[in-house]
Each structure stands twice: as structure tokens, then as C-alpha cells.
Amino acid sequence: MDIRKEKRLNMALQMSNFKKALNRFEKLVEQTAAQKRDERAGLFIHKEDAIGYDKFYASVQKLFGPDVKNQDVKRFYRKLCNNTDASADWCEIFGYFSSEEDPIASQLDEENLVFFVSRKRRILISGSRRRDVIKSIVKIPHLDLLITATQKGLITVFNNQDTSWITGCDYLLQLKRIVATTERTIIVWDYKAQGSSQENYFVIKPMDHCLLCVCVVPLPDHLCRDDILLGDDGGFVNRFTVNSDDFGIKQAKSKRKLQNQVLDSKNFKSVKRKLHNDWVMKIRYISALNCFGSCSLDSNHSLVLESLKRLEDNLPVREFSMPRGANTFCYCVKANVIVTGGDDKVIRLWHPNISTKPVGKLVGHMFSIAEIVTNEKDQHVVSLSSAKVFRVWDIQTLSLLQVFHDSQGGPGDMQIYSMIYDANHGMLITGSSVMDMYPLTRMIQDTKQVPHTHEREINVMLYNKYFHQVLTICSESIIRVWELETGLQVYQILEPHGFNTEVTSAAVDESGFLFATGAYNGTVRIWDFGSGQEMKVLPEGKDWKEDEHCLRRLIFLKAQEKHQQLVLALERNGTIKMIQGKEDDIYLMVIWELPDVVPFLQDGKHAVHLRMSTRDRNMAIPFPDVELIVERNFSQPTDNPTMDLLRVNCIDLLQVEGYNLIAAGTLNGVIILWNFVTSTVKKVYRPEDCFTVNPDLHPKHFKINDILFLFRTPECARRSSQDSICSSSQCESSKGPQSSKGSKQSIHDSEVKGEQTDVMVGKQQPMDKKHPGIANLPEAQPPILVTAHEDGHLRLWTLEGRLLKDMLPFTKHSAISLTSLYTDSCTRILLAGNVEGHVILCNISSFLDPPHDEKKFKQLLSWRAHSLEIIQVIYVEEKQVVLTASIDGSVRLWHALNGHYCGYFGQRRLFELSQTRDFILPCDVTEYPIEIKEESKFTEKQKYEYPLIFDREKWRKMSSVSLLFKRTPPKAFEVEQDFKFFKSLSSPKIRRYPLEGFVTENREAGIVFGSLPIYSISSPTSLRFLPLIGVEAQKDSSDGITGKKKGGHVQREKAPRRRSLKKNLVPQINLASSFFPAIPK
């Protein structure tokens, strides 16, 4: 009764806590709905009080626990934001939705499974005997070797380079040998020996019992020594210690005999202990636990887990008992569990320190379990039954992921005796009469399948920061929305602008609830991002041509009034116009259009003034109605072949901190800046000869493919000054820097020393008492323009047209046309994509600070993302990933830190953004990322001051002959040394006056031999009248050379020999004075 009462009390307590959580959840929903109503009414809500999705999701997790799924909460939150008056059911938080997919069809879809069974590879063991089966498979990860041993004595080593047959069953790490076991012997094989390696092995025998399994204990601290663990049919675990001296490994190669040698097992150090009452089926050494494990068919002593010291004594050991014993076991390091399986068909999970009861059970096999392996990276357990049925389990959730069966082979090939998992190649390997290899599905998808998100080329890619979703549009006019965290598709829209109408542009508003699309025929539609429902439409005009009004760019503007939408659009003909949408009208209308200013700037004018229109409007718009103030005698050219190149190709917008700018780039390389504060439009840059037709250059050589404003708000500038970062990739994702567009910070005056800007900034607002920290924000610097050109150059400009940086990004091939630009919210990094599929990552954090040093603009990384042209590149700050879209029809995901491939949208496998996976490349990319390392300041050559220098004059004075006679005989135990070089060193002579240089070479003789002196002899002198030389030498030699004492003896016998030698060496005539005149000193 006490137990029942306690259970009832616990259930009552749980129900009470759940009711309290539901009440708090209802209050949270009411508060969120009220806040969304206030936002729609136009009321200002502070950022600290705003309930965004991240804050809402954190509150729900706090109420109901971390098991609430992100997708379900996001769906509920989107529904609440779209309709605040709708009834909210708390069951939706827990995913109470009807699934449209068939679970059976999803299970049968092979690409959703773990292993790709249809891609299985089979290797036939050539040379094997009939009915021979593989009994053991061992993987050596660091050498990438695969060792197999058959029942009838054939041992094979597989690798990716060598296909020769050698013998072995496990690998001796220190001795670099392969060890194998037979029923009564141990074989140590030198598979790398010269000559016939098949005959160079050692046999250790006899053994007391029949050996059934073997493993090697890794001993990294002991050189030239390995320990071998053996399990036999008597239940004993044996430990053999082998050294290099036992096999003569240290002998010379000439003395080494290539023959079979039988060694006595009694000569080896070995210990054994009986741990089981039946056969030892498997033995393994677990390095993570610093102990070994052995399993047996014994029901009482099924699994033993102990250190190696327990083999030398009789102390109790850790034993795990299970019915009918265990055939196999393995250890999972991350989960810290031991997985066992045996004849009772149950997989048990044990904690290494709890041997009384398993922590979990996996039931599903219909036959005895023969092998178990683990995939540490994916936390999977793969079990194999004697009927060749494979089951893949998730070790964390204990759920079944996949079941497959090996149906190949005849009746004699039924049993699979061994199985391993190769973590290096992501492959499951089994051994029977053949060797089968099952690759992981993600390995095939990532490396062998061409990524494709759409069937056609991608036209548009957008990222919704509010919902963390990606929108893609292809040329077949299919809109798809994807989850960034998982890569799953949320919904799709077919033919959004009608049948056979291509969508060419799109944009997402600042709140993330709406997105607009523009088509080839000039129509514009506004959609609800959460549901994909169409809200408003701009119909096609009656007099429009087919491609004249094709929309190239859409930008959402911040509306001055509530319940209205404003979109800035760029048409293919270069027209920039504004489209308005009202709440009570389903049709959009064009309310504003910029005049064409390019022809007026062609004749050399630098700027054109604007006149504000006096047209009255019922509502305020971000840009006023303007007209060009031009001279009356100006005539616009009509038939000019360069007029097609004057069209605007790309635009960007800056409306923050008092700036109201539109930048445009044309096909002929002209940069135009519309400034609605100063009422001017000016030509920032114009290339030379851009208005003339040059047959040697491509017509689009000066084309600007993309243009972008680089502006750092005061809040971001303060954050950049506090965070000493070298790149934007090191920015903390939890801080969540906000977008600079539509900021409500205080406006500061902009002044640049040394140059006068024509940008007028509004008056400074009074300091807000509620936000005193705003007054301490640093002053914002003027914006910078960056342009991506057709010639492959990346150029940065001031608003006055001064070139700050002209850079040719470093890729495999130079001068590749750039197509897309992107920067983060705090303008710390700059991303660029080109037509060959490369992504360029640059650090501009320090470059934006005056005086804009060119050396601070640094390219950090470059990698090949696609084989074809990239049309859009996006950087996601909170995840530190890069999104790339290409005309090859795929949208791919990359790590921004190193350029490693994560996956593509449309794949069946979920994304793993937080987990660092192995480096892989898509099948259509073969180039590795290039990291541009900065030259360290410590690598500069250092100048040393030498205290002494070599003096040649001292060296000449100290001749070897004079030193020979001045040298005193050394004493006993004293080394005789000559310090002539050290005596020739002296302090450097510093000249107070510079040396005078002069030219001595003879230019007529040539520069090589022109500096040599040339002498001419008028008539040769007769040799018999030449004066004799050597008189002084004979005088010196006539003096008796006194013998010097050496070891107490006088040397007088060598004097005549030295005198005669001197006579032979000294010349008897003086020829130097005749051929070489005396040179005055």
C-alpha cells in the first residue's frame, strides 16, 4: 500500500507541475500576441523587451524541458505571429500534427538509411581453398591496413597500395610484425622482409590449449616489446611478452636468415589465469579503460573486465553474467558502455563499473548474435546475427535505424564469421567466403553523388535571419524554403508567377515575415514567408515588351506607415523604381521612379543636381520625388553604339545614421551615387575609354557585376574596439550583432580630415535618458563602396571616388570575373564569388578604420565551392557557415573557418553544423582550400653587430714559417693549437668620412676583363745580363739553423736537408722587375 500511495503522490505532483507549466505557457502566448499587435500598430518596443523566436524557444524549453523540438516550436510561433487572434493549442508544442509522409515508404527509401546496401563491394579471396571462410578481421587505423585470417590458414593483408599476399591476424605495433594463431602455435610474421617474405616467420610452440582468439596490447612506452593476449578453449587468458631479441631483429641484414624458425614457448615470459569455465570467444584490450575484456559461453562468467595485473594474481575480477554467455562484445568510448551479444539474441548495454545489471537492452534479432561493432563518430551500434541479418542501432536513443540482410551466397556461405567498422573510410566490412564492404550513405552522398538542390540552375538565394531558413529559386520557377540547421525542406511553390514565367529576383523584409519575388515579365508578388501564401501582386503592363522590364534586383524598404510595403526594384533596362503595397489593396503599384542620369554624365560632368518635386503625396516615402537640373542646350544622344553599355547592372541601398544613398554600377564600369540628403547624383568613378568601342577589348570588360556599401554603425564600432579579433570568423555567435539597416541610434555628424564629403548628415538627436550608453558610442565613419568587376578585380572606393584598394583575389587561376559580394552585419569580413566557383574570404575589420591602410585588407581563405559560376554567396554569423548558390543547380554549405564542406540542401542526411566532420569534397570539386597566411614579424632578418672583424694585414704578418720557429714545444698532456686566426681579429675601424669611388675599368676592353691592368714590353732583355736574385735569401740560408730542442734532443741532422731544399725553391734570377713595374705604395 505504501508503494501505491507513493506512486499516486508522484503522479499527482507531476500533474500539478505540468498544469503550472501550462498556465505559464498561456501567459507567454498572451504576452507574445499582445506584443505582435503593438508592433503592427506602430508602437516602439525596446530590444530588451522584444520576444523574438530565440527568446520564445528558450522560454518554452524552460517550461517543458529540452525535449521540445525546435521545428514544432517554430511552427507554433510562426502561426502565432501571422494570426494573433487565432486559438492556440498547447499540444502543437509537442508536435501533435498529422504527417503527410508515409512512414513505411520513408523507411523503404534507401537514401534515408545508414548504410548504402546497394553500393556494397565484394572482394573474392583469390587462392583460397574450397569451403574456406574468413574467421577474423583486424583493422590497423594508423597504417590503413586490413588483416584477414581464414579458417584453413590463409592470412591476408589488404591496403590501398600493396596487393601482395602476406600472413597475419593482428599487428605488433612495436616490432612491426604480424602475429597469428593456430590451434597450438603462435606465428610471428615479418611481412616486410626482403626476398621471399612468405618464408620469414617464427613459430612459437607448443601451447597447452587450443588458441581461439588473440589481440595485441599497445605499449607505446616500451620500445622493441609487445604483449599478446590469447584466449583458449580451456577458459584461460594468456599473456605473452615478445621482444626484438627473441626474433633476431637487431641482427645485421647479411646475417639474418630467411627461413622458418621454431621457438620454444617456455623461453618466453608468459602468465595465464583461468577466468572462464568455457571457451574464450573474444578478447580485446580497451585502451580507454586501461584494461582487457574477454567473453565466453559461460553463463556465470560471461564477460570479464580487468587490468593486466589481475592475470598475475588470484584476486577477484569484475564479472558480468548473462544467460548462455556472450559471443562478442565491444566498447563505446563516448557513451561509456560495453555492448554484449550472445546466443540469447539480446543485446545488452553495461556500464563498466556496474556488473550486476545492464543499463539497457536491445531486442529484435531472431538468431544468435555473432558480431557487434560500434561507430564512435555517429554513435551507432551494428549487430550481426548468425542468419546474416544486420541491425543498426542508435546508442544514445536505443532506437533501431536500419535492418538489412546479406542475401548473396549459397547454403555453404551462410555464416559471417567476422565484422569490423572502418572509421577512416566510413565502411562496414564483413568476412565469410568473401569480403563485403558496406559504405555509409553519407559517404556516397558526399563524395560520389553530384549535389543538386533544384533540377535547373539557381537564380536567387536568400537567408531569413529571423526564422533561420533559406529560400532558393531556380530558373524553372520553383520556390523552395529550407531549414538551415537540418537542411530539410519546409515547403515549395510551383510556378509562382504563372505558367512558364521565370522568377529572376527576390528579397526578404527586415522582420522576416514577408518576401517578394520579381519575374522575367516585370510582375512582382509579395508572399507570407511562414505559409507561402500569396498576399499582393503587381500585374504586367499592357504595353510592356517581353524582356524590357525583367527585374534584376529587389530591396525591401522600411515603410514610414504601418500595414504597407515598399520595394525598390531594378529592371533590366536600368530603371530604378519603387513599388508600394497597401493593406486594403491586393494590387501593388509603382509610385516612384528615378530618372536616367547616365547620358548626362557621359559628356564629362562630375555631378548633376536634383530638384525636389512639389508633388503632394498622401503618405511619406523614403525617397522624395526628384527631377534632374540640366542645361537647356543639352541634347541626349540617341544613336550611340555605347548606349547599351550605359545601363545600370547592380544597385545597393544605405539608409542608416542619417544617410540616404543609392549606389549603382553600370555595364561600362561607371559608378553612380544618388544622394537624397544633398540632392545630388554624381559620378564616383568612370574608367578611361569606357564610352569608346575598342575592338581589342571585350564589350563587357569594364562591367560591374555587384556593388555593396560597407558601413559600420557606432554600436558595431564599439563592439569591434572591445573585441580584439583578427577576423569575423572569430566573432562570438551568441552576441547576435544587429543589422545596420533601419537603426534607431542617434545620428552623428560626419567629418573626415583632409577631404570634404558632400554627404550631409542630420542633426544630432538629444540623448535618451533611458539609454545613457548610446552617448558613449564612437562616431561612425563614412561608408565605403566595394565593387566586383568583370576583370576579376575587387576595388574599394570612398564616396568621393578615391580608390582605397585595388585587389586581385588569389585563386588557382588569376583574373576570374567576380559575380557576388556579401558582408556581415558589423562589416568585419567580405565574401566574394566568381564565375569558376571560387569563394574568397577577406578580413576588412581593421581596414575600415581610418586611414584605411591597404596592408590591413587581408585575404584569409579561398576555396572551390562549385565547378560552375556562383550567383550568390551568404555568410551566416550565428552558425559561422557560408552558403553558396550556383548555376549547377545546387546550394551548398561550408564552414567559414576552414572552407570545409558540410553538405547541400536537398540531401537526405541531416546537417551536422556543430560537429566537426572529416574533411571531404563534393565529387565535382578536386581543389583543396587555400589558406593565405600572414607573414610573421618575427621572420624578418635581424641585424647583428659583430664586436671583432678579420684583419688581413695581421694575417699577412703572421706567416706560417715565422710561427714555426717562434712556437715553443708543448708540455706533457697539452694540445698543440694554432691561434693564428684568432690573433688576426681586431676591432672594426669606423671611417669618419665616406670612401671616394672611381671607375678603373677599360670600357674598350670590355666589362669583364676591363678592370685588369694591361702592360706592354718594348723589347725583351737578354737573360744572361739579368741581375741575380736570392742573395739575401742565400745570406739567410748561410746562417746555421740552430737546432731546437724537442723532447730533450737536439735536431742537427735536418739542417743540411732544409738548406738544400731552400736552394731548389729560391729562383736564381729576378724576372719580376722586367715584367711587372714597381707600383708605388
UniProtKB/Swiss-Prot annotation:
Q: Where is the signal peptide?
A: none
Matching entries from SMART domains are given as:
WD40
- Composition skew (Basic and acidic residues), residue ranges: 746-756
Q: Where are the transmembrane segments?
A: none
Do the record's keywords include Repeat?
yes
Region entry Disordered, spans: 726-757, 1036-1060
Q: What ranges does the record list as Basic residues composition bias?
A: 1043-1060
WD repeat extents: 102-152, 153-198, 199-265, 266-314, 315-356, 357-400, 401-444, 445-488, 489-532, 533-631, 632-740, 741-803, 804-857, 858-895
Keyword Ribosomal protein included in the entry's annotation: no
Instruction: Tell me the keywords, alphabetical order.
Output: Repeat, WD repeat
UniProt feature, compositional bias: Low complexity: 726-745
The protein's name in its UniProt record: WD repeat-containing protein 64
- Specify the species: Homo sapiens (Human)
